[in-house]
């Protein structure tokens, strides 16, 4: 689990001080999804810049230049590839023809090794599963909604992607990992992995208006935010999206289908409904909450675990492994 965050301000409504404040607020709020590393990509002139470090977001200094209109950010919880080796961290640089881009990923890919062999991708010292998406795009030779869709359609596992090119085109690719987007009347668009993160970040930015609308994306949607603020929507083939899902993608509960799931659903209380809503808003799966309930965790235990994602998924893992031994 990692955090995606960022914004597009095509009409230059934010002065430099507010740009930095918004960037820092989004990054710090996204820490709940990863503290191993943090990074952003932005465009200065027509030069793509990437600033990332193996540090939690609150320890970073976000020195974003004036006149920056797009920020694409990431907070990392390490699953593959040591975060101390900075090339393993997001966003990743890439190049398609004459176009440079940066890519960030939230999720876990299962078929990265298979894709490397199938498409004869070059060896690299970057050890993360995410980087295969960069290599596939580079092999296509151009960067647009079609080639991004082709790459997304080949991925198996869990993901949402964000991609920024040197011309300030920002692509938000919605797979089966969470992504929440708000649009303001000024044309400003802000996004984060979950609604709770986005609300927390924006609450720290009193200079932003309260009036906004949700931009809804479904699995398979690709939203391109152009430099002039126009939105272009396209789709990718989702037939591989839920192929060979593992317990940490689809929810361990579905893997085991215990009978008490129906019991819990029939006997939900107001407090449990609230817990489930909170979990979903934070990017957790309802089925994993039910699994922990069946294992004997009470609602207060689970509520505490939601604030410690590593401990939450650790509890899920222990439960699944124990059942595999039964």
Question: Where in this protein do the model-derived segments appear?
Answer:
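Conserved short alpha-helical segments that host acidic/polar catalytic motifs at enzyme active sites
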Residues: 1-326
């Amino acid at each position: 689990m990692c955090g995606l965050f960022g914004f597009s301000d095509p009409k230059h409504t934010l002065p430099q001080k507010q740009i930095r404040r918004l960037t820092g607020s989004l990054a710090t709020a996204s820490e709940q999804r990863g503290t191993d590393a943090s990074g952003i990509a932005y465009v200065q002139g027509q030069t793509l810049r990437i600033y990332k470090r193996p540090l939690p977001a609150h320890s970073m200094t976000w020195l974003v230049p004036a006149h920056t209109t797009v920020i694409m950010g990431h907070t990392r919880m390490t699953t593959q590839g040591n975060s101390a080796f900075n090339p393993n961290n997001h966003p990743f640089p890439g190049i398609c023809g004459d176009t440079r881009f940066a890519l960030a990923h939230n999720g876990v890919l299962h078929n990265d090794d298979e894709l490397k062999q199938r498409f004869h991708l070059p060896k690299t010292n970057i050890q993360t599963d995410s980087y295969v998406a960069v290599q596939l795009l580079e092999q296509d030779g151009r960067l647009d909604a079609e080639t991004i869709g082709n790459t997304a359609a080949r991925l198996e596992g869990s993901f949402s992607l964000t991609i920024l090119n040197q011309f300030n085109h920002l692509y938000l690719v919605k797979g089966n990992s969470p992504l929440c987007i708000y649009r303001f009347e000024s044309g400003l668009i802000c996004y984060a992995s979950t609604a709770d993160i986005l609300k927390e970040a924006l609450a720290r930015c009193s200079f932003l208006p309260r009036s906004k609308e949700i931009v809804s994306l479904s699995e398979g949607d690709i939203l391109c935010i152009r430099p002039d603020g126009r939105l272009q929507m396209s789709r990718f083939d989702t037939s591989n999206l839920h192929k060979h899902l593992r317990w940490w993608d689809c929810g361990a509960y579905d893997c085991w289908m215990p009978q008490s799931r129906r019991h819990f659903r029939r006997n939900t209380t107001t407090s449990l409904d609230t817990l489930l809503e909170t979990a979903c808003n934070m990017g957790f799966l309802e089925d994993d909450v039910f699994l922990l309930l069946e294992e004997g965790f009470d609602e207060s235990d689970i509520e505490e675990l939601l604030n410690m994602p590593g401990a939450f998924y650790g509890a899920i893992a222990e439960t699944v492994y124990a059942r595999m031994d039964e």
